[in-house]
């Protein structure tokens, strides 16, 4: 095995007397201490010379052991022991560092780049603090600890409330924000009180916008869940109706509104009261005479809002159909009725009820002089109905005079090439250059025969 005192291995003793033991005797320990400690050996023997020869290769290792560099300086064993001593009275050696020194600014924030890399490109001009205890290479995972100090926001009376501060309680602009930051309003919202009295008492939280429409939800309940973010008007002198005065037949239709886009689409989904219908059609949908017909119901025959829909849903069944010839409705004597509750069957005809019932006739607009609606003439149907701007003749089989109109044919003399002769018109320039005309008989210019064309060219050239 290798040994730090015998880097070249153990050799035999002088004279060939056995091999040296792996451990050291007390004499060998005293010899090593005397050689490197500066003390003379009391009883030197002849074995000292042999031991010096064997320990010659260990001098470098011992030198390294007793001369370790600490932060650029060379320390002895006594200095190392003093450095790590637990005695507070021991004088410790001053450690000198070869790393660059940057400005120390106690009270300022630590230079983030210096703390992570132990370097700073600004050098002495850096305005931050550079502690000397940072090791070489810096602290890669260093993060600045945020000071636990509550930031104050400006309260500017007369200015609009900061919407982001009213919603979150924070403002990224801090003291530079030009809006008002009322702390008492934010504390009132964060307290969680949502009763009517609290909201009405704190109605100053809601924005007053005289030029905007009235917030309908605020007018009904005195509350507004969008608070300062609402873009509608919230007057403070409005009378809030109590819940006891509201009729029980009022049904509130409320659409779910996304809070992220509420400020832009509140008007489209705001809640409005709808009175309960008194009559319903055969499908159970409300009939509201005087209201606009439900467009979806008129087109598809159904309505996803059901009984809460505010539009009219007329019964699409045509009950006023003509009776077959020879049938009359006779009143039934009261003596033949089983009870008085069967009076509704008095004027009902069962034969007529089994006749096929279809939608009523649709009348399309008559616009004489306008263009005939092609789709209506082909199919007898027009999806635009009374909004169509074309003419819808009642008799589709009648010929359309405008469709059969043809321009009066002119008597035009043709040349041997089949091109028109128009002596009172200008000569066709393309025909004079190439001898042909792509428009043929439809060309409105003159096409003289070749001999006449050559004569015209020669006369014009002379």
From Swiss-Prot:
It comes from the Eukaryota. Keywords: DNA-binding, Metal-binding, Repeat, Zinc, Zinc-finger. Disulfide bonds: none annotated. One of its GO terms (molecular function) is zinc ion binding. It holds the Pfam family zf-CCCH. A zinc finger (C3H1-type) spans 105-133, 156-184, 209-237, 288-316, 367-395, 422-450. This is Zinc finger CCCH domain-containing protein 8. It comes from Oryza sativa subsp. japonica (Rice).
């Amino acid at each position: 095995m290798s040994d730090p005192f015998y880097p070249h291995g153990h050799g035999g003793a002088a004279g060939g007397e056995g091999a040296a033991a792996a451990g050291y005797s007390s004499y060998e320990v005293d010899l090593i201490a005397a050689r490197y400690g500066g003390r003379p050996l009391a009883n030197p023997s002849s074995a000292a010379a042999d031991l010096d020869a064997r320990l010659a290769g260990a001098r470098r290792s011992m030198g390294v052991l007793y001369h370790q560099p600490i932060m650029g300086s060379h320390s002895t064993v006594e200095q190392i022991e003093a450095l790590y001593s637990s005695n507070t009275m021991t004088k410790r050696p001053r450690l000198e560092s070869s790393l660059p020194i940057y400005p120390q600014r106690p009270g300022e924030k630590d230079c983030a780049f210096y703390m992570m890399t132990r370097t700073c490109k600004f050098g002495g001009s850096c305005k931050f603090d550079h502690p000397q205890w940072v090791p070489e290479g810096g602290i890669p995972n260093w993060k600045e600890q945020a000071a636990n100090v509550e930031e104050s926001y400006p309260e500017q009376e007369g200015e609009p409330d900061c919407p982001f501060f009213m919603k979150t309680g924070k403002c990224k602009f801090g003291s530079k924000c030009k809006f008002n930051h009322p702390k008492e309003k934010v504390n009132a919202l964060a307290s969680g009180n949502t009763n009517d009295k609290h909201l009405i008492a704190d109605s100053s939280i809601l924005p007053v916008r005289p030029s905007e429409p009235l917030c309908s939800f605020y007018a009904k309940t005195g509350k507004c869940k969008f608070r300062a973010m609402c873009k509608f008007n919230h007057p403070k002198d409005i009378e809030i109706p109590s819940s006891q005065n509201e009729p029980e037949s009022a049904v509130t239709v409320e659409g779910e509104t996304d809070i992220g886009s509420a400020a832009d689409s509140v008007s489209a989904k705001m809640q409005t009261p709808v009175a309960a219908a008194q009559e319903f059609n055969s499908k159970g949908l409300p009939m509201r005479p005087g209201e606009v017909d439900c467009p979806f119901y008129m087109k598809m025959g159904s309505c996803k809002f059901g009984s809460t829909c505010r539009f009219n849903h007329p019964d699409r069944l045509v009950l006023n159909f003509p009776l077959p010839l020879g049938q009359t409705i006779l009143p039934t004597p009261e003596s033949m009725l089983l009870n008085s509750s069967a009076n509704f069957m008095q004027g009902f005809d069962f034969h007529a009820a089994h006749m096929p019932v279809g939608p009523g006739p649709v009348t399309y607009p008559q616009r004489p002089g306008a263009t005939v609606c092609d789709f209506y003439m082909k199919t007898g149907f027009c999806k635009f109905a009374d909004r169509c701007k074309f003419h819808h003749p009642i008799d589709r089989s009648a010929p359309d005079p405008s469709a059969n109109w043809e321009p009066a044919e002119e008597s035009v003399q043709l040349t041997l090439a089949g091109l028109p002769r128009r002596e009172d018109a200008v000569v066709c320039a393309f025909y004079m250059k190439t001898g042909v005309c792509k428009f043929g008989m439809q060309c409105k210019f003159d096409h003289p025969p070749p001999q006449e064309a050559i004569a015209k060219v020669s006369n014009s050239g002379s």
